[in-house]
Structures are given as structure tokens and as C-alpha cells.
């Protein structure tokens, strides 16, 4: 019976030279999240009691980026192979727990595959994840005798006959803690690379008469690693295609699945329609019958039923109640809130502002640090002047207010219910309910005016 306790070791010490970057390889992002974070999340979802992260290059940046994860940090000062990396983590292994070995640059490994690997691990043996490739060049080959796994031969150490083998090692395996420590202590670096290979424990286990169970992933892409940006971009497209397929099968209409990116989590209702080149980031909720036009970016926002977001709008940390419309070219920044039926049109920006039920801001407007009531009309070119160079101040506009075009509201200021602000007005003092307020420079007419000419 398999012990349920399990720790996970994630190898993340490589320099990633072929990325040509100052950022550690495992921190390069896939779907908006560091590659290693995908692996950590899988380990946690699998129920790991502890996640050990073996690091080397860029340790400070790794620790800063992953500071919210409950990790045991294991330093590999010299990169002397995968076996050497595991040797650094071995003192933390419990004898009775299982140890699952993963890689920080293999981001698409699925929880389902890892569950099957864990369940397939024989008592006292090893569970090994393998795949068959048409072109296995460069990979360690799985050797078998009478169908049983007997070892792994690295490509550089393989004979011509062994290089014909199509089944290769993915590097992902699981074994008992006490067994793992014993096998790790027996590793040598007598090979072409002069490194300590974790793969040598397969032969050690076989020599002890232990069973090695080989498991295949649902998709080969789950085990593909990243060594350069071309490989990373390829995995990005594979991941996005998988997410798009899931959404389509769940009833979301993606007009072109190849031109949609999900960089987080999307909860959705029925009959949602998403046009091309839309990016969803963070945690986003779309209600029933939501329509999103081409080129939009939605991040960490809640969009209510029957809302329509027209093309090239950006919505971040915002909330839209049902039946709101925004765009095209609208920008809702953090703290923007639209109540039911509100409308924000083209080139309107909102930040930390609330737009009441049925209220409209149609064109060329900035609403910041504002609380706007119901059924308010905000004319084109209106600006809430909320910043004095040092501090932010609030604008409050009551229900049923009409704000004419080209109005400036110099905060802090309050406009009462039913008030009318004439076009071109600069409001610097509070306005009472139902008042008309206007401030304009007198209009001057000069007959026969001659324009200046260039000298």
C-alpha cells in the first residue's frame, strides 16, 4: 500500500544560458505565470506535504518572486547534474514518505499525469514517466529486458544499438525517501559528462530486484522542457490551444481560438462571445451573454450579465454590473465600478470611480476618485481634477445631474442632485441641488480681424 505522504523536489538551478537573459530561466513566463510557478501549483494541487526547490543561479530573484509559496530552499552551489541536485535535497527526505522529482522548466506537466504516476509506483520500487518519440536524439533511452525497465542510458553514453530505442526518459520519477537516499549515495560521475545522473538510480533499483513502473503522460507536451525562447513560445501556443479548446467545449464562443490568450483563470456564464485577439489575465468572471470585442484586455475583473465590451478596451481590477456597455477604446483602471446599465464610451478613462445606474460618459473623459450617481450625463471632454501634485481628492456627483461638454470639476467638490453644469464650466465650489452653474470667459467679436502673417 502506497504511503500517502509525499514531498516534491523541483530542480531549478540551471542558468538557462540559451535564453540569453538576466532572468533565471524558470522565471520566464508561460501564460502570464513563471514556468516554475506552474510546477509549484501542480505540486500543491497534488497534495505535497513539502515542496523543496533546488536553486543556484539567480537565487535572490527566485526567492523574491516566489516569496508567497511555502518552499524549502535548497542551494546547489555547483551544477554537477540532476543526481547532485537531488543529493543536496536528500537530507530533508523522510524515510517513509514518497519523493516526487519535477523540473522548473517543464511547465505543462499535469496533475492528472502525476496522480497516475504516484498511483502506479510499486511498493519499494520506482514510478518513472516515459514517452516514445519518433526522433529521440539527445534524450536518455529506456532499456528493458523481457519488457521490464532495467535502466536509462544517456544519449552521449549510448551505443549505436541503444540509440535506436524510441522510448525516452522524461526525468520525472517517484520513489520512497529511504530508498532514494540510499541510491543517491551510490551515484558516481563515471560518464561522458562527468556528472551525477539521477537516472542511474533506475539501474541501482533494478539490481536490487525492485520494480520500475513506466507511465506515459496523456500528452507528450506535458514533459517538454524549455531551453530557449523558441521552445517557450511553442509551449505557450500549445497551452493556449488547450485552454481555448476547454472553453469552446464549455460553451464559450471564441471567434478564432488561435487568437485568444488566457493568462489566468476564467469563470463564465452561458452564451459568452469573445472576438479575436482578446487577452484574459488574472482572475476574471464573465456573466451570461457577455460580448467582448476584438483586441480587448480584461484583467482581474467581474463582468456582469449582458455586458458588452467594444473593441480595444482595457478593463483592470474593475466591476461591471449587468447590462453595462463600454468602449471602443475605453480604459477602466483599478477601482472602477459601473452599476447596472451604465455606459462608458470611446476614450473614457476611469480610476477609483463609481458610475451609477443608467449613467453615461460617452466620449473623451477622465473620471478619477469620483462617486457619480444614477442617470447622470457626463459630457464629452469632462475631467475630474483629482490631483494637486501631492494628494488625491474626491468628486461627488448626485443623481440626475447633467454635465456639459468640456467641464472641469476641481476636487474636492460635490454637485447636488438634478444640477446642470453648462458646457465649458470649471467647477471649483460645491453645487446645490437643481442649480445651474456656468463659468465662461465673455465672448468677444472683432469685425474685420486680420490674421497675423509670417514675416
From Swiss-Prot:
Keywords: Acyltransferase, Cell shape, Cell wall biogenesis/degradation, Cytoplasm, Magnesium, Metal-binding, Multifunctional enzyme, Nucleotidyltransferase, Peptidoglycan synthesis, Repeat, Transferase. Signal peptide: none annotated. Pathway: Nucleotide-sugar biosynthesis; UDP-N-acetyl-alpha-D-glucosamine biosynthesis; N-acetyl-alpha-D-glucosamine 1-phosphate from alpha-D-glucosamine 6-phosphate (route II): step 2/2; Nucleotide-sugar biosynthesis; UDP-N-acetyl-alpha-D-glucosamine biosynthesis; UDP-N-acetyl-alpha-D-glucosamine from N-acetyl-alpha-D-glucosamine 1-phosphate: step 1/1; Bacterial outer membrane biogenesis; LPS lipid A biosynthesis. The keyword Acyltransferase applies. Acetyl-CoA binds at residues 380, 386-387, 405, 423, 440. It comes from the Bacteria. UDP-N-acetyl-alpha-D-glucosamine binds at residues 11-14, 25, 76, 81-82, 103-105, 140, 154, 169, 227, 333, 351, 366, 377. Its cofactor is Mg(2+). Binds 1 Mg(2+) ion per subunit. Residues 251-455 are annotated as: N-acetyltransferase. Catalyzes the last two sequential reactions in the de novo biosynthetic pathway for UDP-N-acetylglucosamine (UDP-GlcNAc). The C-terminal domain catalyzes the transfer of acetyl group from acetyl coenzyme A to glucosamine-1-phosphate (GlcN-1-P) to produce N-acetylglucosamine-1-phosphate (GlcNAc-1-P), which is converted into UDP-GlcNAc by the transfer of uridine 5-monophosphate (from uridine 5-triphosphate), a reaction catalyzed by the N-terminal domain. Homotrimer. This is Bifunctional protein GlmU. The lineage of its organism: Bacteria, Pseudomonadati, Pseudomonadota, Gammaproteobacteria, Enterobacterales. The gene is glmU.
Amino acid at each position: 500500500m502506497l504511503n500517502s505522504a509525499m514531498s516534491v523536489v523541483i530542480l531549478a538551478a540551471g542558468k538557462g544560458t540559451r535564453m540569453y537573459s538576466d532572468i533565471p530561466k524558470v522565471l520566464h513566463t508561460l501564460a502570464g505565470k513563471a514556468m516554475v510557478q506552474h510546477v509549484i501549483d501542480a505540486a500543491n494541487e497534488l497534495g505535497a506535504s513539502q515542496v523543496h526547490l533546488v536553486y543556484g543561479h539567480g537565487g535572490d530573484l527566485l526567492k523574491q518572486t516566489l516569496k508567497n509559496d511555502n518552499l524549502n530552499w535548497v542551494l546547489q552551489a555547483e551544477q554537477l547534474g540532476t543526481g547532485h541536485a537531488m543529493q543536496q535535497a536528500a537530507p530533508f527526505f523522510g524515510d517513509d514518505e514518497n519523493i516526487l522529482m519535477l523540473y522548473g522548466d517543464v511547465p505543462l506537466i499535469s496533475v492528472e499525469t502525476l496522480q497516475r504516476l504516484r498511483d502506479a509506483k510499486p511498493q519499494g520500487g520506482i514510478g518513472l514517466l516515459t514517452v516514445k518519440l519518433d526522433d529521440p536524439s539527445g534524450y536518455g533511452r529506456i532499456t528493458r529486458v523481457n519488457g521490464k525497465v532495467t535502466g536509462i542510458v544517456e544519449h552521449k553514453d549510448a551505443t549505436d544499438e541503444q540509440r535506436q530505442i524510441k522510448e525516452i526518459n522524461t526525468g520525472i520519477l517517484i520513489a520512497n525517501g529511504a530508498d532514494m537516499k540510499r541510491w543517491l549515495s551510490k551515484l558516481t560521475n563515471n560518464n561522458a559528462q562527468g556528472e551525477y545522473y539521477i537516472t542511474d538510480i533506475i539501474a541501482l533499483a533494478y539490481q536490487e530486484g525492485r520494480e520500475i513502473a513506466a507511465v506515459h503522460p496523456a500528452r507528450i507536451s506535458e514533459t517538454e522542457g524549455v531551453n530557449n525562447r523558441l521552445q517557450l513560445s511553442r509551449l505557450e501556443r500549445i497551452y493556449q490551444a488547450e485552454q481555448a479548446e476547454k472553453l469552446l467545449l464549455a460553451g464559450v464562443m471564441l471567434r478564432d481560438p488561435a487568437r485568444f490568450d488566457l493568462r489566468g483563470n476564467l469563470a463564465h456564464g452561458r452564451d459568452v462571445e469573445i472576438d479575436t485577439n482578446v487577452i484574459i489575465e488574472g482572475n476574471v468572471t464573465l456573466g451570461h451573454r457577455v460580448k467582448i470585442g476584438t483586441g480587448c484586455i480584461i484583467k482581474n475583473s467581474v463582468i456582469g450579465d449582458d455586458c458588452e465590451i467594444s473593441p480595444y478596451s482595457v478593463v483592470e481590477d474593475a466591476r461591471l454590473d449587468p447590462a453595462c456597455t463600454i468602449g471602443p477604446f475605453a480604459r477602466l483602471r483599478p477601482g472602477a465600478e459601473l452599476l447596472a446599465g451604465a455606459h462608458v464610451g470611446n476614450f473614457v478613462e476611469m480610476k477609483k470611480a463609481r458610475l451609477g445606474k443608467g449613467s453615461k460618459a460617452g466620449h473623451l473623459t477622465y473620471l478619477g476618485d469620483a462617486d457619480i450617481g444614477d442617470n447622470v450625463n457626463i459630457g464629452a471632454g469632462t475631467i475630474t481634477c483629482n490631483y494637486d501634485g501631492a494628494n488625491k481628492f474626491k468628486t461627488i456627483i448626485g443623481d440626475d445631474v447633467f454635465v456639459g461638454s468640456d467641464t472641469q470639476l476641481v476636487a474636492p467638490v460635490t454637485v447636488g442632485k438634478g444640477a446642470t453644469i453648462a458646457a465649458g464650466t470649471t467647477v471649483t465650489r460645491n453645487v446645490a441641488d437643481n442649480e445651474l452653474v456656468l463659468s465662461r470667459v465673455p465672448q468677444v467679436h472683432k469685425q474685420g480681424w486680420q490674421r497675423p502673417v509670417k514675416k
